[in-house]
Amino acid sequence: CGAHGTAISFLMNYDRLEFLDAVEELARRAGIEVPKETRQNNQDSDLRDQYAALEAAAKLFQRQLADSQRARDYLDGRGVDADNRARFSIGYAADGYSTLKDALGTDERRLKLLERTGMLSKNDRGHVYDKFRDRVMFPIHDRRGRVIAFGGRVLQKDDGPKYLNSPETALFHKGRELYGLWQVRQA
């Protein structure tokens, strides 16, 4: 192919990774752990927890889609078949104020984690509730395939904003992401 240089520079160019991301990806593939500062370890642990919480939310939404004939009919009507639903991990957030919260927010630490990922909101009285309700859910993946945010499309025309996206978080910066890029790169 005519490429030259190191494995790190190859990953930086081919996968458009930053230097540290390329080093971490190569280490992960080789089964080697990259040493980090203790302060960094605490931050990395929180980020890993956020990735895990978002992945758990995506799985919950996929199960809820399997249980919702109405949501599947909506997607069928839009030409989104079962193969594409699976390929893009499309799901459904049930119509309830605490479905996600009850399923994944099992203690105070997990509730705070779900708030940091933008999956829960808090009203003026301090009541915490699911941000996404009665919406087809589109997980947004980073370039490494990790779920970092969601876009939700309302099923009923008059039920709030047509599209609702995750807020910017430590993992998600809207201007830096392109929906579906990870899936296209897998093809």
Which ranges hold each PLM region?
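Non-catalytic accessory segments of DNA primases and related replication-initiation nucleases
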Residues: 1-116, 127, 135, 150, ...
